[in-house]
Amino acid sequence: MPPSSSITQEDKATIRKYIPKSTNKIIAAAVVKLYVAYPDPNKWNYTGLCGALVLSYDTTAKCCWFKLVDVVNNSGIIWDQELYQNMDYRQDRTFFHSFELDKCLAGFSFANETDAQKFYKKVLDKGCHPESIENPVLSFITRKGSSRHAPNNSNIQPPSAAPPVPGKENYNAVGSKSPNEPELLNSLDPSLIDSLMKMGISQDQIAENADFVKAYLNESAGTPTSTSAPPIPPSIPSSRPPERVPSLSAPAPPPIPPPSNGTVSSPPNSPPRPIAPVSMNPAINSTSKPPLPPPSSRVSAAALAANKKRPPPPPPPSRRNRGKPPIGNGSSNSSLPPPPPPPRSNAAGSIPLPPQGRSAPPPPPPRSAPSTGRQPPPLSSSRAVSNPPAPPPAIPGRSAPALPPLGNASRTSTPPVPTPPSLPPSAPPSLPPSAPPSLPMGAPAAPPLPPSAPIAPPLPAGMPAAPPLPPAAPAPPPAPAPAPAAPVASIAELPQQDGRANLMASIRASGGMDLLKSRKVSASPSVASTKTSNPPVEAPPSNNLMDALASALNQRKTKVAQSDEEDEDDDEWD
């Protein structure tokens, strides 16, 4: 028998040696033992055959086979069986599968439950439906099986040890404990077996766990003598909780008597209730050393501790309701500042409630604390978000004061109607953003432009082109700063020059209106180029999204195809 429960690489090599790949397609393989219900159909008998069970598809005969290969002695195929049509292949246990042969039932006991589950799925999907492997006309044998398999089944000789229901523990030691299972079933009381079966436990499970049932009966034999003891123990714990519940309600009377210590004798009216908590709490009360000997003093101590503890628990509503009577006592005991040790003994007095109450209050405060802590940060973040928009307008304002003439130009640029003449000088700064080499060209062009600045008539048409330029200017702030140095001085001189004659002379000297128009035309294509350049920038994101979606769909298709291929590729079984 192979030492490992799964098929190893050596086992695979042995399997391929005796089941050639040229005429067979291996679907699944696992290490098993072969059992048969023969000659007694009510008992499983181990045949002595074990090895690698292979589910293979014969490509020539177009049918599926069970083939048991001896991987220990390398003796080849020691048993085989053809799968007939509509074969009833059952999974009796996670590790044991059975099916019907010509004369008897056969069963496989798997060494590994994972291999058993995979093998079972393969048999149902493809072994019992070979048409799923290939579509041509299939040749199936009848439910009786072929004649050549009958000798194989008849040659199976049951060994001396015959386990009725093979279990996983029987896999390593054949027939060691299995013969005792029927005796254990017979030793159990039939009424007990019937009651267990009514509770949903099958007879096979009872047989497997017969040792445990017997041991459990022996352990519980001290309390009940009858075999119906197993159902009684579960009923005992069910009766104990109700005793604890009244013990919880019992503390209600103790808080009422604390004002008068003579009322301590009142609890003995219900002795079982105080006795139960005392019996449950001696270990815990051992931590509180004072009230050990007298039970009455324990009750009074519990009442006093309850009174001392009631002040802290008021936050939970349930404790308020329960602690209404002791609140008055708590006020009288409020003079006692050090109740930390009593609450511990008090926690022992009432085990379930105080710790639960204590654990309940702490969570709410941390929840409220983080909630309050989280609320201010979003406010501050929102403020921070609102603050960034303010700096951008401040940035042009700060850059403007750096150059006083530029500040005037910006002021003139804000109102469109009174200051259109100041817009033409903005055209030269537009040239540098288009390309850095144009900066030196803008420097010589600056002298003629200042006199043309005050001219308003030709520029109204250029107004729409000017507004988009300012946003482009802030993109390269360092470049425009050195270039407009010369025009800045000229712009500062513009308000000093008065008289239309000088302006006309300067216009003529600069080349006249035609030159200005040509410059306007040259400025407009730059704006158009910026506008046209923007759409292609926006287009790629849309294409990228579509490409990403398409790639995701393709990946999903490939994954699905791979999963299908994994199911179809049965030659490489693992």
From Swiss-Prot:
Q: Where is the composition biased (Pro residues)?
A: 230-240, 251-260, 352-368, 415-485
Task: Write down the PROSITE patterns for this protein, in alphabetical order.
Answer: WH1, WH2
Q: List Phosphoserine occurrences by residue.
A: S386
Looking up SMART domains in the UniProt record yields: WH1
Localisation per UniProt entry: Cytoplasm, Cytoskeleton
Q: Region labeled Disordered — which residues? A: 144-186, 221-494, 517-574
Per the record, where are the segments of Polar residues compositional bias? 149-158, 521-545
Record-level GO BP terms? actin cortical patch assembly; actin filament branching; Arp2/3 complex-mediated actin nucleation; endocytosis; establishment or maintenance of cell polarity; mitotic actomyosin contractile ring assembly; mitotic cytokinesis
Extract the InterPro entries matched here: PH-like_dom_sf, WASPfam_EVH1, WH1/EVH1_dom, WH2_dom
Spell out the molecular function terms from Gene Ontology. Answer: actin monomer binding; Arp2/3 complex binding
Domain of life where this protein originates: Eukaryota
Which residue intervals define the domain WH2 in the entry? 499-518
Q: Where is the composition biased (Acidic residues)?
A: 563-574
The annotated regions of Low complexity compositional bias extend over 297-306, 324-335
Instruction: Give a GO cellular-component term.
Output: medial cortex
Domain named WH1: which ranges? 19-130
- Which key words tag this protein in UniProt? Actin-binding, Cytoplasm, Cytoskeleton, Phosphoprotein
- Self-association and partners: Interacts with vrp1.
The protein's job, in short, is: Has a role in regulating actin assembly, so regulating polarized growth.
What is the name attached to this protein's record?
A: Actin-binding protein wsp1
